[in-house]
Amino acid sequence: MNGNIDLVVFTLDENRFALKLAAVERVVRVVEFTPLPKAPDIVLGIIAVQGGIIPVIDIRKRFRFPERETQLNDRLVIARTAKRSVALLADDVTGVMACPKERIVEAGKVVSGMAFVEGIVKIDAGMILIHDLDAFLSLNEENMLDDALRESAGSMNGE
């Protein structure tokens, strides 16, 4: 395993998380999102980006962090899964980090029950959890989100 993987590092309550840079489309300041009825609890709502509808995911709920009001300086990390683009709500984005592949430990070797964590990077100040966005939503959550998005699109089109 030679070479580096570029990671976009973001924070939630002083905890560090990352996505592979190749999956990240952009990072933007938080904007108001529209509620999406019948979506899974982890979905805060939807935003419109360049003519597309993107669900906003509350990763606080996935990690069972305390809820908090959205702040004006929060960020949305817009990234692509195999199925769709999603926006992850983060407290801040600290930057891009070139991480040597050999420093990434398989998540299953360190924590169990977190299929949505692909790997862990140990750093001087603790660790960074690398998300696997394709496993972030359960199959049931994916299906609920698909149905909610279809229903929302139908109501916008007057169906």
Each PLM stretch: what is its role?
Residues 1-159:
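An acidic, low-aromatic, low-complexity terminal/linker signal
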